[in-house]
């Protein structure tokens, strides 16, 4: 698997599928505020060949737009880049039903790419299973579907993670490197955890949203291994929820000695016990169809394994605010 340190030590370039002006501009703002000399976005597939206007600081710039993924292969060379000397990423902003085919096509044309962030929700579950196999077979770092992306402060902003305005980027200190990793399936809660951590004075080593669909390509277990293997990461801030077995995979990692770093965790969804039948919450997996996957059972298992687990979200905020 790709390492976070490998991302930091390389030059990262992004190819975008789909035209979402706010997200694209936020990446350019992040690059500019991080003090980079050049933008990280190489080009955008919009369905037509030409250029799109964006801003680099106060200066207006033109970014190449392409008719299809086929045109991606020429962009690195046109920009004077050698693929084996740069980390090439895909930011896929297309709809759920187009996510699989377009990601496959991208990796077919750029097999040396580092990985991808898949933004769309409601990717068909069969497509998600194929994406998981694609990620495993290719050893790429792929977050999503239904992910706000991947952030390595001062280095890479792959998606809307952390916010899409310069004010959000500055106030969350997204350009400053630190030692706290933020991990969650939820995109909204990933951004909230970033605000909580940095608002308390901590700075991030990296942050990622695994993705809110039922079958994410990168599992929470994989994300924790990334944090364990990252020398800059000292602590992990994790937000989970009822449903699924992910937290038991984390317990196993801890018990086997494969994860050793400090974790502050919150598992949401204890309110489900107040209903005659467990309700379906916002994310696809957020439903406790058996006692083992209730929020209370997961909290207990994580606590026994040695994780610092909060009993309320206010307690979670208090614990997180003490991270430095």
Describe these PLM feature segments.
Residues 1-324:
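Catalytic-core regions of core metabolic enzymes
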């Amino acid at each position: 698997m790709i390492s976070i340190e490998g991302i930091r030590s390389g030059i990262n370039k992004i190819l975008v599928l789909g035209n979402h002006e706010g997200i694209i501009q936020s990446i350019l703002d992040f690059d500019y505020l991080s003090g980079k000399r050049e933008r990280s976005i190489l080009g955008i597939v919009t369905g037509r060949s030409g250029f799109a206007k964006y801003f680099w600081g106060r200066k207006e710039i033109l970014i190449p737009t392409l008719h299809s993924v086929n045109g991606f292969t020429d962009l690195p060379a046109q920009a004077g880049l050698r693929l084996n000397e740069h980390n090439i990423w895909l930011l896929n902003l297309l709809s759920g039903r187009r996510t699989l085919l377009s990601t496959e096509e991208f990796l077919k044309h750029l097999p040396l790419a580092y990985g991808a962030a898949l933004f769309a929700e409601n990717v068909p579950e069969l497509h998600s299973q194929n994406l998981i196999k694609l990620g495993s077979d290719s050893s790429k770092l792929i977050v999503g579907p239904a992910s706000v992306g991947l952030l390595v402060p001062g280095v890479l902003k792959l998606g809307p993670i952390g916010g899409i305005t310069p004010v959000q980027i500055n106030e969350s200190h997204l350009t400053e490197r630190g030692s706290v990793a933020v991990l969650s399936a939820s995109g909204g809660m990933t951004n909230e955890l970033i605000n909580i951590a940095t608002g308390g004075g901590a700075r991030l080593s990296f942050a990622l949203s695994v993705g809110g669909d039922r079958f994410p390509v990168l599992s929470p277990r994989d994300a924790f291994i990334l944090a364990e293997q990252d020398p800059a990461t000292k602590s992990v801030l994790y937000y989970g929820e009822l449903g699924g077995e992910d937290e038991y995979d984390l317990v196993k990692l801890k018990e086997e000695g494969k994860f050793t770093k400090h974790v502050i965790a919150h598992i949401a969804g204890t309110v489900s016990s107040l209903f005659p039948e467990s309700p379906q919450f916002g994310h696809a997996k957020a439903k406790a169809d058996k006692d083992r996957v209730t929020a209370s059972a997961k909290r207990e298992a994580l606590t026994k394994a040695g994780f610092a687990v909060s009993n309320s979200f206010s307690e979670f905020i208090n614990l997180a605010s003490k991270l430095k």
